[in-house]
Swiss-Prot record:
This is Phenylalanine--tRNA ligase alpha subunit. Binds 2 magnesium ions per tetramer. Its EC number is 6.1.1.20. Its main location: cytoplasm. SUPFAM superfamilies: Class II aaRS and biotin synthetases (SSF55681), tRNA-binding arm (SSF46589).
Length: 343
């Protein structure tokens, strides 16, 4: 039996060494140490031997079993080490290679314009207000003197939202930031109720939405609207404030501006503001006018006492003019090559 045991050890060591993966190794383990393995069969045969021989051979078989288990464990460790070395080699980093520079982010060009507009108007005493992008039909249209049959109320021009507010008013994505002017003015009036009320001076930048999409229009765009209401604010103030804003924004004193008569439901009189552009061409850059008496009433103000002006400008258009960009869609495509020009 001694020769058989030595052969089992030799066979087990050879079989384990030939196993190139854990699955094969486990199969070889079963051949020697499993329920029907060679060593297990020898242990079962001990019962047929006399007590003295059984004791001697049992000790010998257990010794051989320990040798086989040691060979098995050694091969397991060798396979694990080989797997780890292969993984480390695959994930190795060559520390002599040049490093990758960390790229720096920058403000989007429209956000640069947004911040610049806030800075310019802030320097002459205008507050900055923000409001909800989901507005009520009343706040977006009715409070601003838009009649019920106004084309802007149609689903071809406005994104309506399912559901209504707590007062059963229709909900929509605001088409301009003018609703925030109404909200701000009402809060201003309530704040100074029974007191001497200072003028209302505020700009409202923010995202707005309209059903439109081409090279010069987007269904989502950014707008800034301004409002100045007091007891002696005139159209001349509007011309002075907006002309001064354009000169500071474009950093030019020779900018030519004209106010062209127009119509907007929320202002009377109304004007479109054009800026000289190119070779004798004029480009519309803003809508404006004196706040309509009905809008003043909806703000909680007496139109016989208070007067003021409002204007609204697209931030994308201002950005396009400032940087010479000819396609509005570039702002929304996320092309890093385009955005890096403003880093």
């Amino acid at each position: 039996m001694s020769q058989d045991l030595d052969q089992i050890v030799a066979d087990a060591q050879a079989a384990f060494a030939a196993a190139n993966d854990n699955a094969t190794l486990e199969n070889e383990k079963a051949r020697f140490l499993g329920k029907t393995g060679a060593l297990t069969e020898l242990l079962k045969g001990l019962g047929k031997l006399d007590p003295e021989t059984r004791k001697t051979e049992g000790a010998r078989i257990n010794q051989i079993k320990q040798q086989v288990e040691a060979a098995l464990q050694a091969r397991r460790q060798a396979l694990a080490d080989a797997l780890m070395n292969a993984r480390l080699a695959a994930e190795a980093i060559d520390v002599t290679l040049p490093g990758r520079a960390v790229s720096r982010g920058s403000l989007h060009p429209v956000m640069r314009t947004w911040e610049r507009v806030e800075q310019i108007f802030g320097s002459i005493g205008f507050d900055v207000a923000d409001g909800p992008e989901i507005e009520t039909d009343w706040m977006n249209f009715t409070a601003l003197n838009n009649p019920d049959n106004h084309p802007a109320r149609s689903m071809q021009d406005t994104f309506y939202v399912d559901g209504r507010d707590s007062e059963d008013k229709l909900l929509l994505l605001r088409t301009h930031t003018s609703p925030m002017q109404v909200r701000y003015a009402k809060m201003h009036v309530e704040k100074y109720a029974g007191k001497a009320m200072p003028p209302i001076k505020v700009i409202c930048p923010g995202r707005t939405y309209r059903v439109d999409s081409d090279a010069t229009h987007s269904p989502m765009f950014n707008q800034v609207e301004g409002l100045w209401i007091g007891e002696d604010v005139s159209f001349a103030d509007l011309k002075g404030v907006y002309t001064d804003f354009l000169r500071k924004f474009f950093e030019r004193d020779d900018i030519q501006v004209r106010f062209r008569p127009s119509y907007f439901p929320f202002t009377e009189p109304s004007a479109e503001i054009d800026m000289a552009f190119g070779n004798g061409k004029w480009l519309e850059i803003s809508g404006s006018g004196q706040v309509h008496p009905n809008v003043l009433r909806n703000m909680g103000l007496d139109p016989e006492r208070y007067i003021g002006f409002a204007f609204g400008s697209g931030l994308e258009r201002l950005t396009m003019l400032r940087y010479g960009i000819n396609d509005l869609r570039l702002f929304f495509e996320g092309d890093v090559r385009f955005l890096r020009q403003f880093a």
